[in-house]
């Protein structure tokens, strides 16, 4: 454990320390979402509900089709003459996942969480089994053209065995928290922040799968890093939670000289955002409610995901922040989107998450089609630097293949906004 640097730089007159209310060192944006009329709120709710219904319908249809294909492949290659039990169990687990997800929005119990975990694991195995089925059919067809005989059953067993092994690896890999070290040059970085470190953690998804025990692990690792500030860029929760205070209780143990800052992600929108925010605030974390705070010359800006996702609201909020373009600014925004606006408004560094890096193969490829090079890691958009974390937790399938669960320790240095070191 490294020795902490002297903290004389933090000894400032009363009023300079960031607070949740407007005052010295803090500028609260004129909350655009608070001015929304009741009609617009109802309209937004209806749009969200329609999107959820459409997503669930398409999602369930695709999963049931994948189940049918996997079961049909097993039956063919294993030469089953009677209906095997997996033709009931596998689709049942798929339906159980959707049911547990929807019921979890209203109820919280150990049994429901257990059902969610078991069915979520099956979805991961189903993902790899689907591609194993495709491979089995292709290899079997190719083998038929060769002079050497290959037993189709052995081919299928080999691929399905590989699918199960990959699922086990993905489950173990998802539970290994790695520390990623990044050193970033930021133009006009205040002297007080040069050489200081900040920890970035996103996408814990505390809820059905990951509970307070996981939060304790994350907090312990961050505490060992001794960062000068901690940034939580959304999806701290997985959705609605009956007792959010239990999940955020471990954060009371964490301290950082310059503060711990948080903005919401899209999953907080699935629950009562105000209730979740209140729980986070009670834990001692500074919730950036669409506001800018000045911490020893560094402008720290936070925009919640709902507002950051709307280009007009996002632009309006950043304009209201009245950023000083001659000074360094860090933006917490859950998704690496609307980057042209952030760059135009003079943001120096944006810290995001959301993508999970794609989480499991082959969706790692799909994620890059959506977010491009901003799917993961440190990248540049004009004068804006963007770090997108793959997150500490998982959503849905509790597995990671081709990605890692991470906490990012960023060392700040004064310079031209270029990447120095990344490992």
Task: Set out the residue ranges of the language-model regions.
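Soluble catalytic domains of enzymes that build or remodel membrane lipids, polysaccharides, and related
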Residues: 185-423
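Catalytic cores of secreted/periplasmic lytic hydrolases that degrade extracellular macromolecules
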Residues: 6
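Long, contiguous hydrophobic alpha-helical segments, chiefly transmembrane helices and signal peptides
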Residues: 120-133, 177, 215, 303, ...
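Non-catalytic terminal accessory segments
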Residues: 1, 15-18, 23-175, 417-421
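N-terminal signal-anchor transmembrane helix
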Residues: 112-116, 145-162, 170-200, 207-224
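A broad, low-specificity signal marking well-ordered, structured residues that form hydrophobic/aromatic
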Residues: 42, 166, 182, 298, ...
């Amino acid at each position: 454990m490294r020795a902490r640097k002297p903290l004389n730089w933090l000894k400032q007159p009363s009023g300079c320390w960031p607070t949740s209310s407007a005052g010295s060192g803090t500028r609260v944006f004129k909350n655009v979402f608070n001015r929304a009329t009741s009609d617009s709120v109802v309209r937004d709710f209806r749009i969200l509900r329609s999107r959820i219904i459409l997503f669930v319908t398409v999602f369930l249809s695709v999963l049931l089709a994948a189940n049918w294909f996997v079961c049909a492949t097993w039956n063919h290659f294993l030469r089953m003459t009677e209906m095997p039990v997996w033709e009931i169990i596998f689709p049942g687990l798929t339906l159980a996942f959707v049911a547990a997800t929807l019921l979890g929005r209203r109820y919280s119990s150990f049994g429901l969480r257990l059902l969610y975990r078991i069915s979520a694991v099956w979805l991961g195995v189903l993902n790899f089994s689907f591609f194993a089925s495709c491979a089995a059919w292709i290899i079997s067809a190719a083998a038929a053209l060769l002079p050497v005989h290959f037993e189709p059953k052995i081919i299928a067993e080999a691929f399905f065995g590989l699918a199960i092994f990959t699922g086990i690896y993905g489950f173990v890999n998802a539970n290994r928290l790695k520390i990623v070290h990044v050193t970033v040059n930021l133009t006009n970085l205040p002297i007080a922040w040069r050489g200081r470190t900040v920890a970035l953690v996103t996408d814990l998804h505390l809820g059905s799968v990951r509970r307070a025990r996981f939060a304790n692990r994350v907090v312990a690792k961050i505490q060992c890093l001794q960062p000068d500030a901690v940034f939580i860029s959304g999806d701290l929760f997985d959705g609605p939670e009956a007792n959010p205070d239990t999940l955020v209780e471990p954060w009371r143990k964490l301290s950082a000289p310059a503060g711990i800052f948080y903005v919401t992600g899209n999953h907080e929108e699935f629950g009562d955002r105000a209730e979740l925010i209140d729980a986070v605030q009670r834990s001692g974390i500074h919730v950036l409610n669409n506001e800018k705070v000045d911490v020893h010359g560094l402008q720290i800006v936070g925009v919640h995901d709902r507002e950051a996702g709307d280009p007009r609201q996002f632009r309006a909020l950043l304009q209201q922040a009245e950023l000083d373009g001659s000074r360094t600014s860090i933006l917490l925004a859950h998704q690496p989107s609307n980057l042209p606006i952030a760059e135009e408004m003079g943001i120096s560094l944006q810290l995001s998450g959301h993508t999970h890096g794609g989480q499991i193969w082959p969706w790692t490829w799909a994620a890059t089609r959506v977010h491009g090079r901003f799917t993961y890691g440190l990248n540049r958009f004009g004068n804006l630097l963007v770090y997108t974390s793959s997150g500490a937790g998982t959503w849905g399938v509790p597995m990671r293949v081709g990605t890692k669960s991470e906490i990012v320790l960023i060392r700040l240095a004064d310079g031209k906004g270029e990447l120095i070191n990344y490992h």
